Amino acid sequence: MAFETFSVALDKDKTLIFETGKIARQASGAVLVKMNETWVFSSACAASLSEAVGFLPFRVDYQEKFSSAGRTSGGFLKREGRPSEREILVSRLIDRSLRPSFPNRLMQDIQVLSYVWSYDGKTLPDPLAICGASAALAISEVPQNCIIAGVRVGLVGGKWVINPTRDELSASKLDLVMAGTASAVLMIEGHCDFLTEEQVLEAIAFGQTYIAKICDAIEAWQKAIGKQKNFSAVLDMPEDVQNVVSDFIREKFEKALSFRDKEALEQASKELEESVIANLVQEENSDFSLLNVKAAFKTAKSNQMRALIQDLGIRVDGRTTTEIRPISIETPLLPRTHGSCLFTRGETQSMAVCTLGGENMAQRFEDLNGDGAARFYLQYFFPPFSVGEVGRIGSPGRREIGHGKLAEKALSHVLPETSRFPYIIRLESNITESNGSSSMASVCGGCLALMDAGVPIKAPVAGIAMGLILDRDQAIILSDISGIEDHLGDMDFKVAGTAKGITAFQMDIKIEGITHKIMEQALAQAKQGRSHILNLMTQVLASPKGTVSKYAPRIETMQINTSKIATVIGPGGKQIRQIIERSGAQVDINDDGVINIAASTQESINKAKELIEGLTGEVEVGKVYNGRVTSIATFGVFVEVLPGKEGLCHISELSKQKVDNISDFVKEGDKLAVKLLSINEKGQLKLSHKATLED
């Protein structure tokens, strides 16, 4: 393919440039996207499956090369390897944006790889990666139903900003990443400072205009240079197979839907599927293959569940479309933790635990912008027993990382300022039961665990997951969706916030986009559900506890002049190590001169403060100090009046009477009250014990 390029101007100094035909020419699709000096490369390749499967094997891997910012990793291994949390989150963004664009029953193994090759420290690469991956797929042989594009939207100084720079985003009240087609939204994810539903909708509408512009340009490029799409890899569903399977299960599945609990429904559904396979799969007839029959069974189940909701307004567990499952809350739960809560909503349960600590407990990370440390972080755990299964235990999967980060963002906006609450805060959400909306249960349980731990949050936060049944030109929004509604429905729209406004949201859909009107309805219904949950939460715990747990460390801060930081640290860290050893406290010094002191007892904190004040304090002429004799000479004694500051008390200044032998008067290590008489031009201190006797 010859070198081809096009560009899309979004705003001043924000022009997307797409290039292909120069790099990675053997890939099915390869595109380099540039904006200023941030360049992101994306490739798309597909392989035929040796055996048909009942799902789409689609994999996205996004990687930020340290070399793109002129850096290498600070770790021992300098080669990029295991993806960072941020790389996993961006990979998920790309995956969730692109997945709805593929035809149903596409039997290809598809891989999209995205690399940040150049990063200018200003232009953020994730929306470029979404657009680049979409463009690479668009010009490849991989079949798609639609072209997609992605953008980021910020709210800076009351104005919407498209693809905000890093500096703009730091000042923004909104961080929204969204993807869609030229006419509809496919994916949104973001967090914000208590924006209203109307403001979020306005932001989405603003971003959609730019998405449409990019989609139109990619589509024109596809028509001009794109490869022929391989739609032969898309399996058709024979109409008679779907009809036979639907007729076979109609009455049986209607009976299964009468079961109101997850376990009974799943068991009945499993037995029914086994019966369908045993009775309808025909080895001699490829139309009635195992793959086709299983796919038809899933479609028939979905259609029957939808019909129940559309015709009767009743869901599989007997609820109405706006009804929220029963909620129970127990806090505190665990006796020795700093804060805990057991939050149960229907058959979804989160045991949330809050742990408070000093600076050494901060979550360290490294990315293209350098090293950093998170003051607050939430870790989500999803063990296999939560769904009654046997599975692997180990490092977290992409789903766990994504769910944890969403809940973390939802709660981060209500945390107090560090100056008011200097603790590092770790939240963990242990999912002990799951039947849908576990990430939103993590928000609710996590909020209550924070309050139980005495974290003075600005307001309680609750979360709810909304679903959608879209058929016959009728859109039905479901509040607090269960697992089967997530699996068989058209949308999973999670919204978290306070009574005042929204703090985080995430939407994934399985159809080719939804309209502004549907999102408006979903957000309005989510607000009602959120208010209901917040009311139940505040009935149990109306406000944060006034003090932290007796088992939590005590933390105090003090401010020193930045010129004294080196004095406190000492050569090779000698002084600060001595402070830690002598006080038993953990001491952390920030570049701005703020010192955090953490210890299990107040005595340790006081001792550390005393030692630091001694190092940083200035001696005053005329002031009396209770010093320590550090050495003895024939002409006098040297006395340390403050840590690191000592002076000479001449033999004539030791007593009103004549002192013949200093060793008979004082010993090394003795405490000796001395008065500072003067400081000479060399900074040497002249001390007198005799003057204290006169006083």
Curated annotation (Swiss-Prot):
Top enzyme category: transferase
Domain S1 motif: 622-690
GO molecular function: 3'-5'-RNA exonuclease activity; magnesium ion binding; polyribonucleotide nucleotidyltransferase activity; RNA binding
Cofactor: Mg(2+)
Residues noted as binding Mg(2+) in the record, renumbered to the chain: 486, 492
Domain KH: 553-612
Places the protein is found: Cytoplasm
PROSITE patterns: KH_TYPE_1 (PS50084), S1 (PS50126)
GO biological process, one term: RNA processing
A cellular component annotation (GO) from this entry: cytosol
Keywords: Cytoplasm, Magnesium, Metal-binding, Nucleotidyltransferase, RNA-binding, Transferase
Name this protein carries in UniProt: Polyribonucleotide nucleotidyltransferase
UniProt source species: Chlamydia trachomatis serovar L2 (strain ATCC VR-902B / DSM 19102 / 434/Bu)
Gene: pnp
